[in-house]
Curated annotation (Swiss-Prot):
Span of domain CBS: 203-261, 269-321
Protein name: Arabinose 5-phosphate isomerase GutQ
Assembly notes: Homotetramer.
Pfam family, one: CBS
Residues noted as binding substrate in the record, renumbered to the chain: 68-69, 75, 81, 107-116, 141-143, 267
Residues that bind Zn(2+): H75
Name of the gene: gutQ
Length: 321
């Protein structure tokens, strides 16, 4: 039984891969035309489809929307019961139908023509009513479905999904859509955390900032070091400009060397240590700390004045790994 299941699964994958391998050679003038229509669309891209095509259409709409093209999915039945009112002349409709003859098209196509809405098609039948009405037709045809009964949409839905991805990625690259653009539409995701957060969003502030003055004794600096547990203390002048840092390592070296605890911390600190700019990207700051093999740093403003402190754990807790 297990061999039969494995063979069936592998056969399905092989058939789907075989059909999908034919897609690249089909991309031509219609693909370019479809991409350009979307790129120059002043409104939204409305994706529509029935059954399995509709399920894939929802994913295509979501991919377009998250990669710089305003898009949403409308079910054909809902479109015919009021949702056509959401579609305007500056919009584009991408209709998915393998047969190209979905009965809803008989009513939808004339309404789109009345509104001068550009129609794009994904279909397996290029000369179907849908194919003839569309300004650009993307060929998702298959020689056979992976279903052993040749009934359930399998290979054809894979082709549809891949063609949708190809179209979305081509449009995305043409728009110059980049990582930061992507992060702005995914603020709760890992990429959003990496690219949208600046140091000032994550840094410790107020009483949580370990700080002493240049004239503070090593003893008091040690107490401040212990109070915050950050592994360092920022050493500042009277204008709160950071002049150095006093770390656990500095304290150990000072004590091993026989230094007095009453000595000003300015003599035991590391002068001109690493500081981070409050407005810098958090991901860049984290990478700097890791490159320098340090775990924490003071945060300063554009004038070098202390505004906060941060350590690697603060980045990790924010999802910046």
């Amino acid at each position: 039984m297990s061999d039969a299941l494995l063979n069936a699964g592998r056969q399905t994958l092989m058939l789907e891969l075989q059909e999908a391998s034919r897609l690249p050679e089909r991309l031509g003038d219609d693909f370019v035309r479809a991409a350009n229509i979307i790129i120059h669309c002043e409104g939204k891209v409305i994706v529509s489809g029935i059954g399995k095509s509709g399920h894939i259409g929802k994913k295509i709409a979501a991919t377009l929307a998250s990669t710089g093209t305003p898009a949403f999915f409308v079910h054909p039945a809902e479109a015919l019961h009021g949702d056509l009112g959401m579609i305007e002349s500056r919009d584009v409709m991408l209709f998915i139908s393998y047969s190209g003859g979905a009965k809803e098209l008989d009513l939808i196509i004339p309404r789109l023509e009345d509104k001068s809405v550009a129609l794009l098609a994904m279909t397996g039948k290029l000369h179907s009513p849908l194919g003839r009405a569309a300004k650009a037709v993307l060929d998702i045809s298959v020689e056979r479905e992976a279903c052993p009964m040749h009934l359930a949409p399998t290979s054809s839905t894979v082709n549809t999904l891949m063609m949708g991805d190809a179209l979305a990625m081509a449009v995305m690259q043409a728009r110059g859509f980049n990582e930061e653009d992507f992060a702005r539409s995914h603020p709760a995701g890992a990429l959003g955390a990496r690219l949208l957060n600046n140091v000032h969003h994550l840094m410790r502030q107020g009483d949580a900032i370990p700080q002493v003055m240049l004239a503070t004794s090593v003893m008091d600096a040690m107490l401040e070091l212990s109070r915050t547990g950050l592994g360092l203390v920022a050493v500042c002048d009277e204008q709160h400009v950071v002049k150095g840092v006093f770390t656990d390592g500095d304290l150990r070296r000072w004590l091993v060397g026989g230094g007095a605890l009453t000595t000003p911390v300015s003599e035991a600190m590391t002068p001109n240590g690493i500081t981070l700019q409050a407005q810098s990207r958090a991901i860049d700051a984290k990478e700097l700390l890791m490159k320098r093999k340090i775990t924490a740093a003071p945060v300063v403003d554009e004038n070098g004045k202390l505004t906060g402190a941060i350590n690697l754990q603060d980045f990790y807790q924010a999802g910046i790994i």
